[in-house]
Amino acid sequence: MYWKWLANHRPAAPFPGTVAYWEQRYAAGGDSGVGSYDFFAEFKAEVLNAFVREHGVQSVVEFGCGDGNQLGLARYPRYLGFDVSAAALARCRERFRGDETKSFRNVADYAGEMAELALSLDVVYHLVEDEVFERYMRQLFRAAEHHVIVYASDTADNRGFEGTHVRHRKFTRWIEVNEPRWQLVRQVPNRYPYRGDYRTGSFADFFVYGRR
């Protein structure tokens, strides 16, 4: 009984860092999370596909492509996906094998590639370390020719998330200060807002940026 009690009361392992967390998660067979599946994924695809169609977007770059499930609903003429996880990238390459409109690379190999639209979906609030967040945001806007779409929470309230793989950020303020050539042109609230259960609601909304 003691060993059973001990197993159930061991302290949680310390957070290993953003990059290590996601590589370990995907390597162990984990996925991108509920936000990339089912009705959440359908809502996101509806908004993104409409934007691409309405603005005649021909090229898309995404930072944080994950396991590729969300991408399976996308209708992008040309797509380049980056991720920190080699395991996630391997899944994407296998899933979209033979699709010449899509390519995938490790974000460590980013070499200044640009696209008309740069995407960040369910990523910003998973960038726990300040330096990782800063590097990610600068890379995201550097890669965009005309549009940036961020799907994330926009708050600095992290009560209950300390020590986890989630860190909410007031990222719109960061953009105002650090990317003044870009302006928020539209915000799309989530069709399924968070009401206490992450399986049925999300704390992320869409934030659409364009060049001034």
Residue locations for each model-derived region?
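Class I (Rossmann-like) S-adenosyl-L-methionine-dependent methyltransferase catalytic domain
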Residues: 1-113, 130-212
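A conserved beta-strand element that flanks and buttresses the S-adenosyl-L-methionine
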Residues: 119
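Short catalytic micro-motifs in class I SAM-dependent methyltransferases
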Residues: 122-126
